[in-house]
């Protein structure tokens, strides 16, 4: 049985390439993104895609709750993509969202957690 890795922020450039590489080297990968659809990109590459908001704790039930080897967290709100200056939105997504991802990882019993950010 292959080890499972959940990649948050998989619809971003770094997250996407990371998910593809992990699949290529033999991991089972679950790609998580905020976009409602990945237009079949991940499915075409043998990767499950789950759309969710990392701020909504109820959506974490879409993810496996055990037997997750690793979590890689790239999800973030980029200031350059925001319409105007909204520090509350930035803090909620990047701080509280990360706390939710960490909480999920602890509850799922992951062995490895990686957090990377270009923000």
Predicted regions and their residues:
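N-terminal Rossmann NAD(P)H-binding glycine-rich loop of SDR-like oxidoreductase domains
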Residues: 5-25
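N-terminal Rossmann-fold cofactor-binding loop
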Residues: 32-36, 54
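Rossmann-fold cofactor-recognition segment
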Residues: 44-56
């Amino acid at each position: 049985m292959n080890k499972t890795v959940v990649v948050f922020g998989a619809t971003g450039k770094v997250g996407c390439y990371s998910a593809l590489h992990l699949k290529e080297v033999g991991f089972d990968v679950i790609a998580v993104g905020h976009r409602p659809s990945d237009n079949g990109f991940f499915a075409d590459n043998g990767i499950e895609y789950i759309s969710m908001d990392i701020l909504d704790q109820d959506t974490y039930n879409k993810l496996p709750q055990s037997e997750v080897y690793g979590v890689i967290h790239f999800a973030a709100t980029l200031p350059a993509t925001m319409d105007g200056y909204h520090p509350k939105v930035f803090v909620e997504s990047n701080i509280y969202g990360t706390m939710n991802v960490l909480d999920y990882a602890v509850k799922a019993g992951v062995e490895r957690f990686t957090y990377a950010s270009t923000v």
